[in-house]
């Protein structure tokens, strides 16, 4: 196991046997038991002064600057436009340990890990993909899920809030051949986001990038690209995406003096691994409600 210079110093202090036990020898129940003892001991030692000091200084604990009364109407409009195909899901704030690493491609130090062997949700698309995979494995042919959830991340050296409200859609379906499933899912998601851009985010637009030439031709024939800016894949490779997308992806951009990206979406291979079925196709998409709200003010001015 590789670690940081700081963690290497700590491992040297506690010794090889403790390291081996914590990393490998203890089973999950034993490890949770030990960590629970650590948490109880540390919590008992805290004083009210410690609590308020941590609240003032720890960026992970700081409230967002967004007033909930400003987010509620935006979230309501996002829900009102969701197609009937989608089932609403209320996710836990926790997800399986390793979701950020194996689904989002994030390092474990960029998510909040709990002492109970779980992690705090960093992207609702991860939780929806896990739930969609569970439903697909129990016999559902096509699964379309929607949610909004407060997500927390541990970005270092950032002035932004460590948590945000995100609204997400996830679709999982079996491969129909000829990229027909991919085209169907893109139609479903992009129709929704086109409507949202027209009603919720007045100056918003969708930028679509397609890396598969066959799919690009199919989308053009179906009219999927209507009202959408299409970006050549080679011109978009240097811009980072929120998740490791394949085949096709899209961004939601608000025009202004400095264009602002408020969300994105694309095809992922998550459900293929989670369902152990290489024929599964999964499309995810979402926006940061925190990022969207200021642009709804601009539209009202």
Residue ranges and their predicted role:
Residues 79, 194-198, 297:
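Generic structural signal for well-ordered alpha-helical scaffold segments
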Residues 151-229, 239-240, 246-249:
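Extended accessory regions or peripheral subdomains of proteins
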Residues 63-70, 119-122, 178-181, 185-188, ...:
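Catalytic cores of large soluble enzymes that bind and process phosphate-bearing ligands
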Residues 55-61, 167-172, 253-255:
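Short, hydrophobic beta-strand segments
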Residues 2-31, 218-301:
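A translation/RNA-centric and nucleic-acid-associated enzymatic feature enriched
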Residues 2-162:
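Class II aminoacyl-tRNA synthetase-like tRNA-binding/catalytic domains
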Residues 89, 144-148, 167, 208, ...:
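Hydrophobic faces of well-ordered beta-strands that scaffold small-molecule active sites
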